[in-house]
Amino acid sequence: MNKKNLHTFHVPVMGLAFTIDTPVRISKYGINSVISIVDDALMEKMREYYCRKSEIPYDPISDKAEDYRAKRITAYLNLIDKIVKYEFEEFKNLALEDSSGLEKYIDMLPEDSKLKLSYKKFTKKNNSKEELKRWIQKNLTAGNADVNIMTKVDKENYYKNEKLPVEYNDAHAALRGFAKSNLNSSLILSAGLNPRLYSYIEKFEDFYPNENGQLKKKIILKVSDYRSAIIQGKFLAKKGLWVSEYRIESGLNCGGHAFASDGYLMGPILEEFRTQKETLIQTTFDILSLSLKNKNRLCPDLPMDVKITAQGGVGTYEEHQFLLDYYQLDSIGWGTPFLLSVRFV
C-alpha cells in the first residue's frame, strides 16, 4: 500500500544502534524512522530482548547456521513489524475509551494537515462511538519502519576457509534479510553505487509494481547531489527498479559526521533538484518502462510517486519550513535532536 506521509519530518538512521528499535516507540504516531541492518548480532540480541518483553517464544539463530545473517535480519524485522502492528491496534482501540492518545496523535501533525483539519471538523459533531471507530480505521496510519544498508559495507565471507558466493556478502545478505521480511516499507541505500548489490535487488518480487501500480517494498537513494541521483536512478531503472525517494544528505553538516565532497552547500544542490525533478522522473520512467516490458512485467502507464527529501544541519522550525516551501521537499530528516529524547532512541 502506498501512503502519503502524515508528517513533514522523519527520523533518519543514527549509527548502528540509536534507532535500532525506534519504530516500536513512535510508529503508532504515524512517524517514519529508519533501522540500520548492518549489525546482525545486535539485531539478534534485540530480538531476544523484545521476545522476552512481549512474551513471544524466542528461537535463537546461531552464527553457525547457514545464511544466519539474512535469517537474523528477517526474524528481527518480522518481530518489529508484528510489535508495531499490535501496538498500533492497541492504540486505536484505546482511543475509543480515552481520547488523550488520539489527541496527542493529532496534535503532533502539522497545522495545515488535512487529517488534523478533518479531525477538528469531525469532533464538532456529536458522533457515536461507532462513527469514531470508523473514522479512526479510515484515517490513522502507522509510521514506516524503513531500513538502511551502507552499500559499500559488503565484506566477503568465508566458511571453512572457502569464500562463499557473492550473495553471502554482508550487504547482499542484509538486502535478502529485508526482502524476505513482512515489512511494507523502504530500503534506503547509502554510501554510493554498488552495481552488484543493485543488480541483486532484481531477484526480489516485492520491489516490482503490482497490478495496481503499487510497491510493497520501495527504494530510497541517499545522495549528495543531483548527478549522483540521476546516475543511480537510471542504473536501477535499467533493472526494472523504481526509486521512490531521493534523500539528499548534507556532506558538510549531518549529525557530527562529514564525508568527502566538493564543498557545495545544500542550497544550490536542492535548487537543482527543484528545477530538474520532472526531468529526473521522466528520464528514469522511460528507462523503467522499457525494462519492465522486456521482462514481461506489469508497467504503470504513468510514473509512480517520487519524493524529494533532505536531512542534515537543520536547526530551527523556520529552516524546516523554508526547505519545505521553497525547495518543495516532502520531508526533512531530524536526527540529532531526537538523540536527546529517550522516547525516540
State where each predicted segment sits.
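Structural signal for hydrophobic packing residues in well-ordered secondary-structure cores
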Residues: 46, 50, 54, 84, ...
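Core catalytic machinery and nucleic-acid-binding channels of phosphodiester-processing enzymes
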Residues: 166-167, 175, 181-195, 204-207, ...
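Glycine-rich phosphate/ribose-binding loops and adjacent secondary-structure elements
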Residues: 221-345
